Amino acid sequence: MRKEILAKAMAGRRLTAEEALDAGRSLAAGRTEHLHCAAFLAALAARGETAEELAGLAAAFREAVSPMRAFPDAIDTCGTGGDGRHTFNLSTAAALVVASLGVTVAKHGNRSVSSSCGSADLLERAGVPVDGSPSDAEERLTRQGFAFLFAPRFHPAMAHVAPVRRALGARTAFNLLGPLLNPAGVRRQVVGVFSKEGAVLVADALAALGVERALVVFGEGGYDEAVLHGRVHVIDIEGGDISRYHLGPSDFGLPPGRPEDLAGGGSEENAALLDELFEGRGPRGLRHAVAANAALALSVSGKAGELREGVGLAEDAMTSGRARRFLESLRADDMGVRRAQVS
């Protein structure tokens, strides 16, 4: 890393996007000593990262991603995680529901870091392939309309900063980068963020990186998902325009929920809950929460014009068996299975 960039960061001064890009390239290439990497990340965190810095770092690590064919019409529901709530994997379940309805989903994610069960942990326990190569992901997206993009498989450059992040043991810019690094080049996203301030940063960075449409959400009470027991803070990005608003249960056409509706456990417990939901017999409050998050993704994809329409589609997918049949097709990992077969 260039000494003048490190010195500027340590002096508490903001970096330009170009300087952050330069620093990110050095980090991604493993050219920065661990001590300097730690000083850089700690300095940004102490002062507070800017959207320009986040976008610059993201651009650098996008350059270092394991290459795969772009799927710009696909969507992603990858969030930051890190809310510490140990809830059920709402965004992962919602991604499967949305994919069962014919929307191509390139689900970016990882194993658990601060939660009891990460997206990769849940899907693996549910029998869905999670550790495929880029070519495997391309094939699954083309044939089945869903692929899990396991972050460590697609971002080998992250290994250069992983020891530093573990040693620091505190949040850094990298806790916000995940949703900005989808390897499939998606242009439409729903991103849950663990704090209101983080949501603003992620939204502004997504806009700077040229996202076509995104909903960045923060659930009141500290949730990185849409919730039904409080307001959902939404930052809506469309074609470069950014708007902010709140959503409540009535906007989804659903009754108010309770925090305990979202309770999850380890991978075994959450996989069992997923099966129950997709068999139409899961806890009603949890099913409503999954439907609300799926509705956001259906809206972003253009599949549903209104949130209430999206909720109806999602509820039907879960109660009719459509989502269950789609999940079974993923478990079979039959590359010849097409979505038409689960219609």
Where are these regions (language model features)?
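Short glycine-rich or small-residue beta-strand-to-loop segments that form or flank ligand, phosphate
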Residues: 10, 41-45, 76-81, 297
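Short amphipathic alpha-helical face segments that pack within enzyme cores
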Residues: 39, 93-97, 289, 293-296
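A glycine-rich phosphate/pyrophosphate-binding beta-strand-loop-alpha-helix module
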Residues: 41, 88-144
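N-terminal basic/disordered segments at the start of proteins
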Residues: 1-13, 77-85
